[in-house]
Regions:
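…; additionally, a secondary subgroup of soluble metalloenzymes is captured
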Residues: 1-106, 113-169
Length: 169
């Protein structure tokens, strides 16, 4: 089972962010889908033993261990960076401003505490669809990207959302 066998080793904060955004997020995705399907089955009581086992693995073998490993690097950091991962405060200039300079349209989905794995699911849904233009002769090409960013610290809604907007320090 993936939760018990995941190698959660990392040698730096940057490596941890990269490994999460390439591999580990899938564990969160599988867990979310499992809990969703258990609820939707209407048979939650029949799944009780399995649900308890998965909840314990997810909480103790994954979330706790991963959180402890990340915390080690957070505690040791003298400067809050994880190059090449961009900082949250660089979001607008790096991802939005280039579209605006070219007078292109851009849509940004900002959701408080949207998990990376849900962003991945949205990315996959968008890649699987073509959106027809009004005249049906031209198809609009959606460009959808998902990149991790390093959150502001302390991490709370008002500070995080403000960091995404163009402003001076």
């Amino acid at each position: 089972h993936a939760l018990g066998e995941a190698n959660l080793a990392m040698d730096s904060l940057a490596e941890g962010v990269q490994r999460y955004s390439r591999f580990w997020y899938q564990l969160d995705q599988l867990y979310r889908k499992f809990t969703y399907h258990v609820r939707m089955s209407g048979q939650a009581s029949l799944m009780g033993s399995l649900t308890e086992q998965i909840e314990n693995l997810y909480s103790n073998n994954y979330l706790l261990k991963l959180g402890d490993r990340f915390q080690t690097f957070v505690d040791a950091a003298s400067k809050w960076e994880a190059f090449p991962v961009r900082k949250q405060k660089e979001f607008f200039e790096h991802w939005v401003r280039p579209f605006l300079r070219k007078d292109n349209k851009v849509c940004v989905i900002i959701s408080d505490a949207m998990r990376y794995e849900i962003g991945d699911e949205l990315l996959r849904l968008n890649h699987s669809q073509n959106v027809p233009n009004d005249n049906e002769k031209v198809r609009q090409q959606l460009v959808v990207e998902l990149d991790p960013v390093l959150s502001m610290l302390p991490s709370y809604t008002q500070l995080g959302m403000a960091a995404l907007l163009p402003n001076k320090e």
